[in-house]
Amino acid sequence: LLSNEMTCGALLMLDMNDFKEINDNYGHAIGDKIITKTAKRLKEMFRNDDILCRLGGDEFMILCRNIDEISIRMKLEDVTRQMKIPYLIEEYQIMAPLSIGFVMIPLYGTTFNNLYKKADIALYKAKQDGLASYRMYHDDMNKKAL
C-alpha cells in the first residue's frame, strides 16, 4: 500500500454496533438510511485523500494516508464522539455507534491482506471492549487470536 505519495498511514475497519437490532426494530428501509447517513457522516469527518469504502452490511474500511499514530487516535476520538450522536430518521432517534479497529502502516505491514487481517483482529478487540470504542493492532493481539 505504500507509494511515493504515501509513506505511512493507517487502515481502519469499522463496524456498527447492534445494526441487526436496528433492522429488526425499525425495518430494513430505516437500516438502509442509517447506512447511507453513516457513510456521509464518515466522509465528512475524514480528509479528501482518505479512501472510504463500504465492505458490505454494516462494515466500512478507511485507508488514511500519511497520518501518524497520535493524529489517527485524535481523529478516532472525534469519530467515536460524533457517531454517538443519534440519527433523526422519520420520527425516530436512532443511535448507531461504531467499533473501530486499526493498524498502522508500515509498522505492522505494507500488503493489503496482511493489514486487513490485523485491522480485523483489532476490530474484534474493540467490539469486546463495548460500544463506540477503538483499538490499535499490536502483535500481542495476534498471539491471543490464534
What are these model-predicted stretches?
Residues 2-10, 17-47, 53-57, 61-65, ...:
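Conserved long alpha-helical elements within nucleotide-processing catalytic cores of c-di-GMP signaling
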Residues 2-5, 68, 87, 91, ...:
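Flexible interhelical turns and helix-capping residues at alpha-helix boundaries
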Residues 11, 60, 98-102:
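A structural signal for short, well-ordered beta-strand segments
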Residues 11-13, 136:
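Core hydrophobic beta-sheet residues of small sensory/regulatory alpha/beta domains
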Residues 15, 22, 42, 83, ...:
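A general marker of short, structured functional hotspots
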Residues 29, 46, 87-88, 96:
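Hydrophobic beta-strand core residues of beta-sandwich domains
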Residues 52, 78, 82, 88, ...:
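Cyclic nucleotide signaling catalytic output domains
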Residues 72, 93-94:
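Generic alpha-helical segment signature
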